[in-house]
Amino acid sequence: MQSNQAEMGPGSGPEIERRLRGWAAGKGPLHVRLAAALKAAIERGDVLPGTRLPPERRLAKALSVGRSTVVAAYASLAKQGLVARRQGSGTWVEPVGDYARGRAGELATRAQHRLFAVSSFDERHGAISLFAATPDSVAAVGELSAQAAEEIDRVSEHHGYWPLGYPPLRQEIAKRLTARGLRTAEAEVLVTTGAQQAIALTAAAFVGPGEFVVLEDPTYPGAIDAYRQTGARILSAPVGPTGIDLDLVREVLARADVKLIYATPSFQNPTSALMPIGERHRLAQLASDHGTLVVEDEAHAELAFDAAAPPPIAAFADGASVVTIGSLSKVFWGGLRVGWIRAPQPVLSHLGRLKAVFDLGSSLPSQVLAALLLQRADEIIPIRIEELRSRSALLGSLVSTHLPGWSFAEPAGGLVLWTKLPHGSASELAEVARANGALILPGSMTSPSDWFDDHVRLPYVARPEVLEQGVRRLARAWQAYCGQDTRREREVGVIG
C-alpha cells in the first residue's frame, strides 16, 4: 500500500468536496460537523493512513467556510489521535493499527442496523410504505403454484437436500445468463435464499476484519450491513450516470490492498445508473490487474425499460476475478426468497461449502416454483417491465406536482426514483413522514459514509392508487417539516 505520500485525492477543490459530500448536514457548529465527517471518512477507510490532508486555506476555500473552521476541525481530530500536525509539513492521518482492529467488533455489532431498520418498518395503523423496493407478485406465481405442487410431490421421494440448489433451477439460471452474454454452466450456479444471502456469503467467504473493500456510495443498504458484519474497512466510491467512479477506484487500488469491490452495474440501487459495456470491461481489467475480486449485483438487470442492459461484468473477465449475483425477487416476487451466485467452479465450491454450514440448501418448494417461472420468463418479464415503466412515470409526475422543489433523473430501468431535497435532512423528514402515515428511506441509509441525507429513495413498485396517496401524505409531511425547519432557523440563527 502506497500511503506515506498519499494526498486526499488529486487535491482539487471539487475532489475534496466529493469526498466530504453532505458534511454540513445536521446540527451544531460547523467545525464540529466537519471534524465528524473527517473522522467518519478516516474510520471507514475513505481517507487512508498516511494521507496528507489538504492545507487549511485550500480546504476552507473548497468548502466555502472560514479557515478557522478547518483549523478547529483538524485540532479536534488531533486531540482524538486520528491525525498528526507536523510543523512545516501539514496534517497527516495517523496509522490506525490496533484502533482499526478494535473497531472491527464494534462495526460488526452495528452492521445489521440498516437492513433491520428497513425490514422492521411495518404498515400498521394504515401507514403507506414508500421505502421497500419490492414489487408484488406477478400473476404467474399463483397460476403455476398447482404445477409446482405436482413437481414437489414427484421430487418428494428424494431426500430434498441439494446444497448447491435444485438442479432444474440451476439449469434455468445458467440458460438465462448465457442468453445475456455470460456463458454459464449449471456447475457454475449456486442457489441462495435471496440476493441478500448471496451478498452475505461472498462477504463472509472473501473478506476478513480490517481488510479493505470498496462499495458504491450510495448503494444497497443490505450490502453495507453484510460487509460491516465482517469487520472490513469500507472505502466508498461515488456513483455517476455510468456507475461507480472507476477513476477513483483505480486510484484506491493503487494505494491500498483491496480485497473486494461490490458494484451494481445494471440500474444501480438507488441511483438507477447503468454502466456501459466499455466501463464494465474496464472494471474487469482493473480487478484482474490488481488481484481484486469484483462482486457484481445484477438483481435489477432484467428490468430495462428500453434497451437491454449489457452483459454482466463477468463476461469481460478472465479467470476468477468476478462473481455475479442475482435475484428473482424483483422480477417475480420477493416472497420466493430465491437468489443465486454465478462463479467459476472452484470458487463456487468454496461458497457452496460455506452455505451448507448455514442451511444445507434453500427452500425446495420456492426453487421448484422459481424454475417454472424462469421457463416462462420471456412471457412474464415484459409484463413486469411495462408495469414498472408506467408506475415510474406516475411517481415522477406525482413528485413534480406535489413536491415541486424536489429533483430527480428519470430512470431507464430498475425500481426506484432517487430524489434530492432542496434543503433539510431526509432523516428528520422521515420521522415527520412517519407521523403523517408515510414510510420513506433516507438517503443516508444507503451510504457507507452516512452521506446523502439530502436524498430520499422512492420506489415505484406499489399500485397507482397507493403511490398517489403515499406521495400526498409525503407532501403534507414535507410542508410540516419545512415549517419546523423555518422556526428552528429563527430560534437558533445561523451557526458559523
Task: Explain the meaning of each model-derived region.
Residues D297:
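Glycine-centered flexible beta-alpha turn that most often forms the glycine-rich phosphate-binding loop
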Residues A84-R85, T184, I440:
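Short beta-strand "wing" residues that participate in macromolecule-binding interfaces
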Residues M1-E150, G352, A356-S362, L372, ...:
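N-terminal basic, amphipathic alpha-helical segments
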Residues S156-H290, E302-G319, L467, C482-G496:
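Conserved core of the PLP fold type I
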Residues E157, L351-F358, L374-G396:
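Structural signature of PLP-dependent enzymes
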Residues V65, A343, W418-H423, I440-Q479:
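Conserved PLP-binding active-site segment of the aspartate aminotransferase-like
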